[in-house]
């Protein structure tokens, strides 16, 4: 299960934050990602840490969710992950929560995601029949 996640580090490195309007470079070079070097000083390091580099190796079904108005991580990161998996004929379902952020704040969305997590895990871990939304999503 992948939620509101980064798929392609180089593209996020070279993007503008929806929150601040500033570059995302600081996250990588001196903060959260702790890369300590620029993309241009350590391209291989960025690629090595980027899920987009390894997407062909995915073997398990993936449930991806994102908030459509996420100011932290552009929802296009989740969409790109989904599209890559679909193109590679991997089993994947994408959930897009409209008018939600990086964290789901609406009770309705939280409950929905909880039940979908539950359905997903029961289907894949307990080998029970899939919920209708899973069947539709995997087509």
Please name every model-derived segment:
Residues 1-139:
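Active-site-proximal cap/loop segments of hydrolase catalytic domains
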């Amino acid at each position: 299960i992948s939620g509101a996640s980064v798929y392609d580090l180089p593209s996020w490195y070279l993007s503008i934050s929806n929150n601040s309007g500033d570059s995302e470079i600081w996250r990588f070079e001196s903060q959260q990602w702790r890369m300590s070097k620029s993309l241009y000083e350590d391209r291989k390091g960025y690629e090595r840490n980027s899920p987009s580099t390894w997407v062909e190796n995915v073997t398990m079904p993936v449930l991806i969710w994102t908030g459509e108005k996420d100011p932290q991580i552009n929802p296009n990161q989740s969409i790109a992950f989904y599209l890559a998996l679909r193109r590679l004929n991997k089993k994947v379902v994408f959930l897009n929560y409209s008018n939600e952020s990086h964290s789901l704040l609406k009770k309705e969305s939280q409950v929905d995601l909880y039940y979908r997590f539950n359905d997903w895990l029961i289907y894949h871990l307990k080998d029970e029949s899939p919920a209708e939304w899973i069947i539709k999503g995997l087509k």
